[in-house]
Protein backbone atom coordinates (compact mmCIF):
# COMPACT_ATOMS: atom_id res chain seq x y z
CA UNK A 1 0.00 0.00 0.00
CA UNK A 2 1.44 3.41 -1.03
CA UNK A 3 0.11 6.99 -0.87
CA UNK A 4 0.84 9.25 -3.89
CA UNK A 5 0.26 13.03 -4.07
CA UNK A 6 -0.95 14.12 -7.54
CA UNK A 7 -0.90 17.89 -8.31
CA UNK A 8 -1.60 19.96 -11.38
CA UNK A 9 -1.24 18.41 -14.78
CA UNK A 10 1.30 15.89 -13.65
CA UNK A 11 0.86 12.55 -15.46
CA UNK A 12 1.43 9.27 -13.69
CA UNK A 13 1.30 5.73 -15.08
CA UNK A 14 0.35 2.85 -12.77
CA UNK A 15 1.03 -0.82 -13.31
CA UNK A 16 -0.72 -3.34 -11.06
CA UNK A 17 0.88 -6.65 -10.24
CA UNK A 18 -0.86 -9.74 -8.96
CA UNK A 19 -0.15 -10.44 -5.32
CA UNK A 20 -0.59 -14.17 -4.71
CA UNK A 21 -1.31 -15.32 -1.20
CA UNK A 22 -0.68 -18.94 -0.26
CA UNK A 23 -3.10 -20.43 2.22
CA UNK A 24 -2.15 -23.38 4.38
CA UNK A 25 -5.62 -24.91 4.12
CA UNK A 26 -9.25 -24.13 3.41
CA UNK A 27 -11.90 -25.76 5.60
CA UNK A 28 -15.46 -26.14 4.31
CA UNK A 29 -17.98 -27.34 6.88
CA UNK A 30 -21.35 -28.86 6.04
CA UNK A 31 -23.67 -31.72 6.90
CA UNK A 32 -23.84 -34.87 4.84
CA UNK A 33 -27.10 -36.01 3.29
CA UNK A 34 -27.31 -38.77 5.89
CA UNK A 35 -26.89 -36.29 8.75
CA UNK A 36 -29.54 -33.97 7.27
CA UNK A 37 -32.00 -36.86 7.08
CA UNK A 38 -31.37 -37.88 10.69
CA UNK A 39 -31.98 -34.31 11.86
CA UNK A 40 -35.17 -33.94 9.79
CA UNK A 41 -38.80 -34.32 10.80
CA UNK A 42 -39.05 -38.03 9.94
CA UNK A 43 -37.96 -40.95 12.10
CA UNK A 44 -35.24 -42.18 9.77
CA UNK A 45 -31.89 -43.92 9.97
CA UNK A 46 -29.41 -43.26 7.17
CA UNK A 47 -26.77 -45.98 6.87
CA UNK A 48 -23.46 -45.20 5.20
CA UNK A 49 -22.38 -48.54 3.74
CA UNK A 50 -19.16 -47.52 1.97
CA UNK A 51 -17.00 -49.43 4.46
CA UNK A 52 -19.03 -52.61 3.92
CA UNK A 53 -19.62 -52.67 0.18
CA UNK A 54 -16.87 -55.18 -0.64
CA UNK A 55 -17.45 -57.59 2.22
CA UNK A 56 -19.28 -60.90 1.97
CA UNK A 57 -22.32 -59.45 3.75
CA UNK A 58 -25.50 -58.88 1.78
CA UNK A 59 -27.76 -55.85 2.23
CA UNK A 60 -30.19 -57.65 4.52
CA UNK A 61 -27.36 -58.32 7.00
CA UNK A 62 -26.28 -54.67 6.85
CA UNK A 63 -29.83 -53.38 7.38
CA UNK A 64 -30.24 -55.77 10.30
CA UNK A 65 -27.67 -53.71 12.26
CA UNK A 66 -30.07 -50.78 12.55
CA UNK A 67 -31.79 -50.05 15.85
CA UNK A 68 -35.46 -50.98 15.70
CA UNK A 69 -35.01 -53.16 12.60
CA UNK A 70 -35.08 -56.95 12.77
CA UNK A 71 -34.60 -59.39 9.90
CA UNK A 72 -35.40 -63.06 10.33
CA UNK A 73 -34.12 -65.29 7.55
CA UNK A 74 -35.52 -68.77 7.01
CA UNK A 75 -32.16 -70.23 6.00
CA UNK A 76 -29.02 -69.51 4.03
CA UNK A 77 -28.31 -67.44 0.94
CA UNK A 78 -31.45 -66.75 -1.10
CA UNK A 79 -33.89 -67.84 1.58
CA UNK A 80 -37.06 -65.92 2.32
CA UNK A 81 -36.81 -63.31 5.04
CA UNK A 82 -39.10 -61.14 7.12
CA UNK A 83 -38.10 -57.56 7.91
CA UNK A 84 -39.80 -55.76 10.77
CA UNK A 85 -39.48 -52.09 11.73
CA UNK A 86 -40.56 -51.36 15.28
CA UNK A 87 -42.74 -54.48 15.20
CA UNK A 88 -44.37 -53.80 11.81
CA UNK A 89 -43.59 -56.24 8.99
CA UNK A 90 -44.89 -57.86 5.82
CA UNK A 91 -46.83 -55.66 3.41
CA UNK A 92 -46.63 -52.72 5.83
CA UNK A 93 -42.98 -52.29 4.78
CA UNK A 94 -42.04 -51.12 1.26
CA UNK A 95 -38.70 -51.20 -0.54
CA UNK A 96 -37.32 -48.62 -2.99
CA UNK A 97 -34.27 -48.23 -5.20
CA UNK A 98 -33.48 -44.54 -5.78
CA UNK A 99 -37.12 -43.76 -5.03
CA UNK A 100 -38.45 -46.39 -7.47
CA UNK A 101 -40.35 -49.39 -6.04
CA UNK A 102 -37.87 -52.28 -5.86
CA UNK A 103 -40.62 -54.58 -7.19
CA UNK A 104 -40.10 -52.92 -10.57
CA UNK A 105 -36.80 -54.79 -10.91
CA UNK A 106 -38.66 -58.10 -10.74
CA UNK A 107 -39.82 -60.52 -8.08
CA UNK A 108 -36.38 -62.16 -7.88
CA UNK A 109 -34.52 -58.97 -6.84
CA UNK A 110 -34.45 -58.46 -3.05
CA UNK A 111 -32.18 -57.11 -0.33
CA UNK A 112 -30.55 -60.55 -0.23
CA UNK A 113 -29.12 -60.48 -3.78
CA UNK A 114 -28.84 -56.78 -4.68
CA UNK A 115 -25.09 -56.05 -5.19
CA UNK A 116 -23.79 -54.00 -2.22
CA UNK A 117 -21.08 -52.20 -4.23
CA UNK A 118 -23.65 -50.10 -6.13
CA UNK A 119 -24.97 -48.59 -2.88
CA UNK A 120 -24.09 -45.18 -1.43
CA UNK A 121 -26.43 -45.23 1.57
CA UNK A 122 -29.63 -46.83 2.85
CA UNK A 123 -32.51 -44.76 4.24
CA UNK A 124 -34.78 -46.58 6.70
CA UNK A 125 -38.01 -44.74 7.53
CA UNK A 126 -39.72 -45.90 10.71
CA UNK A 127 -43.45 -45.32 10.69
CA UNK A 128 -44.41 -42.26 8.63
CA UNK A 129 -43.08 -42.38 5.07
CA UNK A 130 -42.43 -39.16 3.07
CA UNK A 131 -45.06 -38.25 0.51
CA UNK A 132 -42.45 -38.03 -2.26
CA UNK A 133 -41.90 -41.81 -2.13
CA UNK A 134 -45.54 -42.34 -3.07
CA UNK A 135 -46.37 -45.48 -1.12
CA UNK A 136 -49.17 -46.90 0.98
CA UNK A 137 -46.80 -48.37 3.59
CA UNK A 138 -47.97 -48.08 7.19
CA UNK A 139 -44.95 -49.50 9.00
CA UNK A 140 -42.06 -47.86 7.19
CA UNK A 141 -39.88 -48.01 4.10
CA UNK A 142 -36.34 -48.88 3.02
CA UNK A 143 -34.95 -46.59 0.31
CA UNK A 144 -31.66 -47.74 -1.24
CA UNK A 145 -29.64 -44.88 -2.77
CA UNK A 146 -27.09 -45.87 -5.40
CA UNK A 147 -23.73 -44.26 -6.09
CA UNK A 148 -24.23 -41.08 -8.18
CA UNK A 149 -20.58 -40.00 -8.53
CA UNK A 150 -19.74 -38.18 -11.75
CA UNK A 151 -16.39 -39.88 -12.34
CA UNK A 152 -14.86 -43.00 -13.82
CA UNK A 153 -14.51 -46.03 -11.58
CA UNK A 154 -14.26 -49.82 -11.56
CA UNK A 155 -15.30 -51.97 -8.60
CA UNK A 156 -15.01 -55.76 -8.71
CA UNK A 157 -15.55 -58.09 -5.75
CA UNK A 158 -15.52 -61.87 -5.42
CA UNK A 159 -16.01 -63.85 -2.22
CA UNK A 160 -16.12 -67.51 -1.25
CA UNK A 161 -17.70 -68.64 2.00
CA UNK A 162 -19.15 -71.66 3.75
CA UNK A 163 -21.59 -74.14 2.20
CA UNK A 164 -20.18 -73.70 -1.34
CA UNK A 165 -21.25 -70.06 -1.45
CA UNK A 166 -19.86 -67.85 -4.22
CA UNK A 167 -20.64 -64.15 -4.76
CA UNK A 168 -19.37 -61.99 -7.62
CA UNK A 169 -20.17 -58.28 -8.06
CA UNK A 170 -19.07 -55.97 -10.87
CA UNK A 171 -19.81 -52.25 -10.94
CA UNK A 172 -18.21 -49.68 -13.26
CA UNK A 173 -18.80 -46.28 -14.81
CA UNK A 174 -17.30 -44.32 -17.68
CA UNK A 175 -18.02 -40.60 -18.02
CA UNK A 176 -17.17 -38.48 -21.05
CA UNK A 177 -16.56 -35.14 -19.31
CA UNK A 178 -16.93 -32.97 -22.43
CA UNK A 179 -20.35 -34.27 -23.42
CA UNK A 180 -21.62 -35.43 -20.01
CA UNK A 181 -22.54 -38.84 -21.44
CA UNK A 182 -22.01 -41.79 -19.11
CA UNK A 183 -22.46 -45.55 -19.15
CA UNK A 184 -22.72 -47.68 -16.02
CA UNK A 185 -22.75 -51.50 -16.29
CA UNK A 186 -23.62 -53.68 -13.27
CA UNK A 187 -23.36 -57.45 -12.97
CA UNK A 188 -23.98 -59.66 -9.95
CA UNK A 189 -23.95 -63.43 -9.45
CA UNK A 190 -24.72 -65.43 -6.30
CA UNK A 191 -24.78 -69.19 -5.80
CA UNK A 192 -24.81 -71.54 -2.83
CA UNK A 193 -25.47 -75.18 -2.00
CA UNK A 194 -26.82 -74.18 1.44
CA UNK A 195 -25.90 -77.68 2.62
CA UNK A 196 -25.51 -76.77 6.27
CA UNK A 197 -26.59 -79.07 9.08
CA UNK A 198 -29.90 -78.68 10.89
CA UNK A 199 -30.26 -79.75 14.51
CA UNK A 200 -33.15 -81.58 16.14
CA UNK A 201 -34.88 -82.86 13.01
CA UNK A 202 -37.29 -85.75 13.38
CA UNK A 203 -36.27 -88.96 11.55
CA UNK A 204 -37.44 -92.56 11.78
CA UNK A 205 -35.00 -94.95 13.47
CA UNK A 206 -35.70 -98.50 12.29
CA UNK A 207 -33.60 -100.20 14.97
CA UNK A 208 -35.42 -98.38 17.77
CA UNK A 209 -38.77 -98.48 16.01
CA UNK A 210 -39.55 -94.84 16.75
CA UNK A 211 -38.87 -91.26 15.66
CA UNK A 212 -35.69 -89.70 17.07
CA UNK A 213 -34.14 -86.23 16.83
CA UNK A 214 -30.85 -86.01 14.97
CA UNK A 215 -28.60 -83.55 13.15
CA UNK A 216 -29.03 -83.74 9.36
CA UNK A 217 -27.57 -81.92 6.37
CA UNK A 218 -29.86 -80.02 3.98
CA UNK A 219 -29.75 -81.76 0.59
CA UNK A 220 -32.15 -79.82 -1.66
CA UNK A 221 -31.56 -76.10 -1.06
CA UNK A 222 -29.39 -74.88 -3.96
CA UNK A 223 -29.71 -71.20 -4.85
CA UNK A 224 -28.61 -69.23 -7.91
CA UNK A 225 -29.26 -65.60 -8.83
CA UNK A 226 -28.05 -63.36 -11.62
CA UNK A 227 -28.54 -59.63 -12.18
CA UNK A 228 -27.30 -57.66 -15.18
CA UNK A 229 -27.95 -53.97 -15.75
CA UNK A 230 -26.78 -51.21 -18.09
CA UNK A 231 -27.49 -47.54 -17.47
CA UNK A 232 -26.81 -44.94 -20.17
CA UNK A 233 -27.45 -41.24 -19.72
CA UNK A 234 -26.29 -37.65 -19.83
CA UNK A 235 -25.76 -35.01 -17.13
CA UNK A 236 -25.39 -31.25 -16.79
CA UNK A 237 -27.29 -30.19 -19.87
CA UNK A 238 -29.40 -27.09 -20.33
CA UNK A 239 -32.53 -29.19 -20.75
CA UNK A 240 -31.74 -31.69 -17.97
CA UNK A 241 -29.53 -32.04 -14.93
CA UNK A 242 -29.68 -35.78 -15.51
CA UNK A 243 -31.44 -38.07 -17.96
CA UNK A 244 -30.80 -41.79 -18.19
CA UNK A 245 -32.24 -45.00 -19.58
CA UNK A 246 -31.72 -48.29 -17.72
CA UNK A 247 -32.21 -51.86 -18.92
CA UNK A 248 -31.86 -54.83 -16.58
CA UNK A 249 -32.33 -58.60 -16.50
CA UNK A 250 -32.56 -60.84 -13.44
CA UNK A 251 -32.88 -64.59 -12.96
CA UNK A 252 -33.21 -66.80 -9.87
CA UNK A 253 -33.40 -70.56 -9.31
CA UNK A 254 -34.27 -71.81 -5.83
CA UNK A 255 -34.67 -75.39 -4.67
CA UNK A 256 -37.24 -75.89 -1.90
CA UNK A 257 -36.17 -77.98 1.08
CA UNK A 258 -38.99 -77.71 3.63
CA UNK A 259 -42.59 -76.66 3.96
CA UNK A 260 -44.17 -74.52 6.65
CA UNK A 261 -42.67 -76.77 9.33
CA UNK A 262 -39.30 -78.51 9.42
CA UNK A 263 -40.73 -82.02 9.50
CA UNK A 264 -42.17 -81.57 5.97
CA UNK A 265 -39.26 -82.27 3.60
CA UNK A 266 -39.12 -81.65 -0.16
CA UNK A 267 -36.67 -83.29 -2.53
CA UNK A 268 -37.75 -82.20 -6.04
CA UNK A 269 -39.82 -78.99 -5.84
CA UNK A 270 -38.24 -75.74 -7.00
CA UNK A 271 -39.09 -72.14 -7.78
CA UNK A 272 -37.76 -70.10 -10.70
CA UNK A 273 -38.10 -66.51 -11.85
CA UNK A 274 -36.80 -64.22 -14.56
CA UNK A 275 -37.60 -60.60 -15.30
CA UNK A 276 -36.70 -57.84 -17.73
CA UNK A 277 -37.03 -54.13 -16.93
CA UNK A 278 -36.56 -50.91 -18.85
CA UNK A 279 -36.86 -47.51 -17.22
CA UNK A 280 -36.10 -43.84 -17.81
CA UNK A 281 -35.46 -41.09 -15.25
CA UNK A 282 -35.29 -37.32 -15.65
CA UNK A 283 -34.20 -34.58 -13.22
CA UNK A 284 -34.17 -30.80 -13.68
CA UNK A 285 -33.62 -27.97 -11.22
CA UNK A 286 -35.29 -24.61 -11.91
CA UNK A 287 -37.58 -26.26 -14.45
CA UNK A 288 -39.81 -23.37 -15.52
CA UNK A 289 -38.73 -20.75 -13.02
CA UNK A 290 -36.23 -20.53 -10.20
CA UNK A 291 -36.54 -22.87 -7.21
CA UNK A 292 -38.93 -25.28 -8.99
CA UNK A 293 -37.31 -28.73 -9.15
CA UNK A 294 -38.76 -31.64 -11.09
CA UNK A 295 -37.99 -35.34 -11.39
CA UNK A 296 -39.84 -38.08 -13.24
CA UNK A 297 -39.67 -41.84 -13.68
CA UNK A 298 -41.20 -44.29 -16.14
CA UNK A 299 -40.66 -48.05 -15.84
CA UNK A 300 -42.02 -51.25 -17.35
CA UNK A 301 -41.24 -54.79 -16.17
CA UNK A 302 -41.83 -58.22 -17.69
CA UNK A 303 -41.84 -60.52 -14.65
CA UNK A 304 -42.29 -64.29 -14.83
CA UNK A 305 -42.06 -66.82 -12.01
CA UNK A 306 -42.73 -70.54 -11.96
CA UNK A 307 -43.14 -73.17 -9.25
CA UNK A 308 -42.34 -76.73 -10.36
CA UNK A 309 -43.93 -79.49 -8.27
CA UNK A 310 -44.20 -82.66 -10.38
CA UNK A 311 -42.76 -85.38 -8.14
CA UNK A 312 -45.18 -87.87 -6.56
CA UNK A 313 -42.76 -88.55 -3.72
CA UNK A 314 -42.49 -88.08 0.02
CA UNK A 315 -38.95 -87.39 1.26
CA UNK A 316 -37.36 -87.61 4.70
CA UNK A 317 -34.20 -86.03 6.13
CA UNK A 318 -32.15 -89.06 5.09
CA UNK A 319 -32.74 -88.05 1.44
CA UNK A 320 -34.86 -91.14 0.96
CA UNK A 321 -38.38 -91.24 -0.39
CA UNK A 322 -41.45 -93.33 -0.97
CA UNK A 323 -43.69 -93.04 -4.01
CA UNK A 324 -47.08 -91.41 -3.43
CA UNK A 325 -50.05 -90.19 -5.46
CA UNK A 326 -49.66 -86.53 -4.46
CA UNK A 327 -47.19 -83.74 -5.19
CA UNK A 328 -44.90 -82.36 -2.50
CA UNK A 329 -46.15 -78.82 -1.81
CA UNK A 330 -49.94 -78.84 -2.03
CA UNK A 331 -50.62 -82.58 -1.85
CA UNK A 332 -52.51 -82.35 -5.14
CA UNK A 333 -51.82 -83.29 -8.76
CA UNK A 334 -48.60 -82.53 -10.63
CA UNK A 335 -48.11 -78.83 -11.23
CA UNK A 336 -45.93 -76.39 -13.18
CA UNK A 337 -47.54 -73.15 -12.06
CA UNK A 338 -46.72 -69.94 -13.97
CA UNK A 339 -47.23 -66.35 -12.84
CA UNK A 340 -46.76 -63.55 -15.35
CA UNK A 341 -46.88 -60.17 -13.62
CA UNK A 342 -46.19 -57.19 -15.88
CA UNK A 343 -45.72 -53.98 -13.90
CA UNK A 344 -45.91 -50.33 -15.00
CA UNK A 345 -44.62 -47.58 -12.72
CA UNK A 346 -44.79 -43.85 -13.45
CA UNK A 347 -43.92 -41.04 -11.08
CA UNK A 348 -43.79 -37.24 -11.29
CA UNK A 349 -42.50 -35.03 -8.47
CA UNK A 350 -42.47 -31.24 -8.16
CA UNK A 351 -40.64 -29.47 -5.34
CA UNK A 352 -40.87 -25.68 -4.96
CA UNK A 353 -38.82 -23.75 -2.39
CA UNK A 354 -40.72 -20.68 -1.20
CA UNK A 355 -37.55 -19.58 0.61
CA UNK A 356 -34.71 -21.16 2.56
CA UNK A 357 -37.07 -22.41 5.28
CA UNK A 358 -40.32 -23.31 3.52
CA UNK A 359 -41.05 -25.62 0.58
CA UNK A 360 -43.96 -27.43 -1.06
CA UNK A 361 -43.78 -30.89 -2.64
CA UNK A 362 -46.33 -32.53 -4.95
CA UNK A 363 -45.93 -36.19 -5.91
CA UNK A 364 -47.94 -38.53 -8.16
CA UNK A 365 -47.31 -42.27 -8.48
CA UNK A 366 -49.03 -44.75 -10.79
CA UNK A 367 -48.38 -48.44 -10.14
CA UNK A 368 -50.16 -51.09 -12.23
CA UNK A 369 -49.61 -54.81 -11.66
CA UNK A 370 -51.00 -57.64 -13.76
CA UNK A 371 -51.29 -61.23 -12.54
CA UNK A 372 -51.79 -63.88 -15.20
CA UNK A 373 -51.76 -67.42 -13.80
CA UNK A 374 -51.81 -70.74 -15.64
CA UNK A 375 -50.51 -74.29 -15.25
CA UNK A 376 -48.76 -76.46 -17.84
CA UNK A 377 -49.83 -79.88 -16.51
CA UNK A 378 -52.66 -79.36 -14.00
CA UNK A 379 -55.74 -79.18 -16.24
CA UNK A 380 -58.06 -78.57 -13.27
CA UNK A 381 -56.35 -75.28 -12.43
CA UNK A 382 -58.48 -72.20 -13.12
CA UNK A 383 -56.60 -69.66 -15.19
CA UNK A 384 -56.89 -66.01 -14.23
CA UNK A 385 -55.83 -62.58 -15.42
CA UNK A 386 -56.07 -60.11 -12.53
CA UNK A 387 -55.16 -56.41 -12.39
CA UNK A 388 -54.33 -54.08 -9.51
CA UNK A 389 -53.75 -50.39 -10.30
CA UNK A 390 -52.86 -47.72 -7.74
CA UNK A 391 -52.88 -43.94 -8.03
CA UNK A 392 -51.17 -42.26 -5.07
CA UNK A 393 -51.14 -38.45 -4.84
CA UNK A 394 -49.16 -36.72 -2.10
CA UNK A 395 -48.93 -33.07 -1.07
CA UNK A 396 -46.50 -31.95 1.64
CA UNK A 397 -45.45 -28.66 3.20
CA UNK A 398 -41.98 -28.57 4.77
CA UNK A 399 -41.12 -26.02 7.44
CA UNK A 400 -37.73 -25.24 9.00
CA UNK A 401 -37.69 -23.03 12.10
CA UNK A 402 -35.27 -21.77 14.75
CA UNK A 403 -32.25 -21.96 12.49
CA UNK A 404 -32.92 -25.60 11.68
CA UNK A 405 -33.51 -26.74 15.25
CA UNK A 406 -37.19 -27.41 14.55
CA UNK A 407 -38.47 -29.15 11.41
CA UNK A 408 -42.14 -29.72 10.62
CA UNK A 409 -43.78 -31.61 7.77
CA UNK A 410 -47.49 -31.39 7.03
CA UNK A 411 -48.75 -33.75 4.35
CA UNK A 412 -51.85 -35.36 2.90
CA UNK A 413 -52.13 -38.42 0.65
CA UNK A 414 -54.92 -39.68 -1.57
CA UNK A 415 -55.12 -43.35 -2.60
CA UNK A 416 -57.15 -44.47 -5.60
CA UNK A 417 -57.17 -48.24 -6.21
CA UNK A 418 -58.60 -50.28 -9.06
CA UNK A 419 -58.89 -54.07 -8.70
CA UNK A 420 -60.11 -56.64 -11.22
CA UNK A 421 -60.09 -60.28 -10.06
CA UNK A 422 -61.06 -63.27 -12.20
CA UNK A 423 -59.71 -65.90 -9.78
CA UNK A 424 -62.36 -68.51 -8.97
CA UNK A 425 -60.48 -70.91 -6.71
CA UNK A 426 -59.15 -70.53 -3.19
CA UNK A 427 -55.78 -68.82 -2.74
CA UNK A 428 -54.39 -71.71 -0.68
CA UNK A 429 -55.03 -74.02 -3.65
CA UNK A 430 -53.80 -71.81 -6.49
CA UNK A 431 -51.11 -69.72 -4.82
Annotate each predicted stretch with a short phrase.
Residues 100-127:
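Short acidic/polar hinge/loop motifs at secondary-structure boundaries
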Amino acid sequence: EQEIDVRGDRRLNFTLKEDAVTLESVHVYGKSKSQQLREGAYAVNALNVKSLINTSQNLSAIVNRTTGVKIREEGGLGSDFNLSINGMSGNSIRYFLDGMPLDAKGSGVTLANLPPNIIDRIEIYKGVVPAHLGTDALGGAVNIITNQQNKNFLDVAYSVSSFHTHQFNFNAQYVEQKTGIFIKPVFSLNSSKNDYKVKNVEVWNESKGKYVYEEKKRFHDDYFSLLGQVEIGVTNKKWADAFCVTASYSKTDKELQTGAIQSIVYGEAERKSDSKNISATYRKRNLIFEHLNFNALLSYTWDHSCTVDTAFRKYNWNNKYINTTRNEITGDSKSIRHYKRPRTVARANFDYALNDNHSINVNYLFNRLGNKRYDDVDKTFSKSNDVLAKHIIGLSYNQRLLDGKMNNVFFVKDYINYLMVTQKDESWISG
